Regions:
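Acidic catalytic/metal-coordinating carboxylates
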Residues: 33-37, 65-68
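A Lys-centered signature of the CheY-like receiver
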Residues: 109
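Active-site beta3 strand of CheY-like receiver
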Residues: 46-56
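Charged docking surfaces used in two-component/phosphorelay signaling
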Residues: 16-24
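Short amphipathic alpha-helix used as the core "switch/output" element in two-component signaling
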Residues: 40, 67-79
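Receiver (REC) domain active-site loop signature in two-component systems and cognate sites
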Residues: 61
Length: 126
């Protein structure tokens, strides 16, 4: 079965490049523009929770930031999913907050496709 990943980022460019990279590696991707949009998409996936392999999320987003989104996910029936956090060099201080909220790993932006795929494989196949 194809592994399904939810990608959450307010930048359409980042979402598209991540989706392209993941599609080329054989993953199915659903995109969300912020934490609120992602929660709505997760709710619509409730019946197929076992088809979702992981979540990749940005930290700084409008409406609902990544930390708040992670906290919501970890209190839901999706709590078992690994969550990979995107952060920029200037946001590295947020890594600890992400870990405390329940993130499983992180990738610093800008990233190379190989870095992203290595981090994804490490979490999906763990």
């Amino acid at each position: 079965m194809e592994k399904h990943i939810l990608v959450v980022d307010d930048s359409p460019t980042i979402r598209s490049s991540v989706a392209f990279c993941l599609h080329n590696a054989g993953y199915k991707v659903t995109e969300a523009e912020d934490g609120q949009d992602a929660l709505e998409k997760l709710e619509s996936m409730r019946e197929s929770v076992h088809n979702l392999a992981m979540i990749i999320t940005d930290i700084n987003m409008p409406r609902m930031d990544g930390i708040t989104f992670i906290e919501h996910v970890k209190k839901s029936h999706f709590r078992f999913l690994p969550i990979l956090v995107f952060t920029t060099e200037s946001e590295k201080s947020m890594i600890q907050k992400g870990k405390e909220a329940g993130a499983s790993g992180w990738v610093v932006k800008p990233f190379q496709p190989e870095q992203l795929l290595w981090a994804v494989k490490k979490l999906v196949w763990a």
